């Protein structure tokens, strides 16, 4: 079964982008291609089907130093997985240096690594969470820590899958404002979501996915319209813009 079919997508460095689509559109598979959890079928013409930073072949550990990715799977793995959330905020961020998902049993953690972890937590306004176990954090707190984990290697780009899932209205707004600050600081942001409300003002390009294909792509104002969204969500969607954000309703 083809989940993504003849999908062509280019995101330039510094081009903040939102990938928007309903459930089943292929968003998760697209992320898995970036993380090398899934692999695309070879093209008949021999052209590499996926390139990241211009390269088709990557050492996964090297790639993770340039591309930070935060997914709901990572959240569940660290907070609800084998470690049962017993690791602290600092330990979670430090694990980003070693691409591990749990305790740092065999890693050598230097004072420099701890300093960089503290800096990453501070960027997400999460430094007070350094000593707090993940399973005692709210959803919003844990999400900030996981993004700090992705930032700790100073990546060029950050891919966020449903970044505000599980947050209430106030927490979501504050959280997305912090993502906006990262964008303004020079980190390329790629938001993958099915919520229009999660698209921060800094986003310039929107890609609309539907049934594994790019239904439309272009500048944000021309993509976030009632016409386009009603088509990909297969329902009458109205759009309103306020303070740089877009809001949808049926």
What kind of feature is each model-predicted range?
Residues 94, 98, 108-129:
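Conserved ABC ATPase "signature" region
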Residues 107-108, 133-137:
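Conserved ABC ATPase signature
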Residues 154:
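Conserved catalytic motifs of ABC-family nucleotide-binding domains
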Residues 158-162:
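Catalytic Walker B motif of ABC-type/P-loop ATPase nucleotide-binding domains
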Residues 193-194:
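H-loop/switch region of ABC-family ATPase nucleotide-binding domains
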Residues 206-219:
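H-loop (His-switch) and adjacent beta-strand-loop-beta switch element
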Residues 226, 230-250:
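ABC ATPase nucleotide-binding domains
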């Amino acid at each position: 079964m083809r989940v993504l079919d003849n999908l062509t997508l280019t995101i330039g460095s510094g081009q903040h982008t939102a990938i928007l689509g309903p459930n089943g559109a292929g968003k998760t598979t697209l992320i898995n291609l970036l993380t090398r959890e899934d692999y695309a079928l070879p093209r008949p013409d021999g052209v590499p089907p996926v390139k990241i930073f211009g390269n088709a072949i990557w050492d996964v550990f090297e790639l993770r130093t340039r591309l930070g990715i935060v997914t709901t799977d990572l959240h569940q793995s660290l907070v609800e997985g084998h470690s049962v959330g017993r690791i602290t905020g600092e330990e979670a961020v430090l694990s980003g240096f070693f691409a591990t998902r749990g305790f740092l049993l065999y890693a050598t953690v230097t004072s420099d690594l701890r300093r960089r972890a503290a800096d990453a937590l501070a960027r997400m306004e999460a430094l007070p969470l350094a000593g707090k176990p993940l399973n005692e954090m709210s959803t919003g707190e844990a999400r900030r820590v996981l993004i700090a984990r992705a930032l700790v290697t100073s990546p060029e780009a950050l891919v966020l899958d449903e970044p505000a899932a599980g947050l209430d209205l106030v927490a979501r707004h504050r959280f997305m404002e912090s993502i906006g600050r990262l964008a303004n600081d020079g980190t390329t942001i790629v938001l993958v979501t099915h919520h229009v409300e999660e698209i921060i003002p800094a986003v310039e390009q929107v890609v609309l996915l539907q049934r594994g294909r790019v239904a439309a792509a272009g500048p944000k104002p021309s993509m976030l319209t009632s016409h386009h969204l009603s088509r990909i969500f297969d329902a009458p969607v109205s759009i309103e813009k306020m303070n740089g954000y877009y809001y949808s309703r049926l």
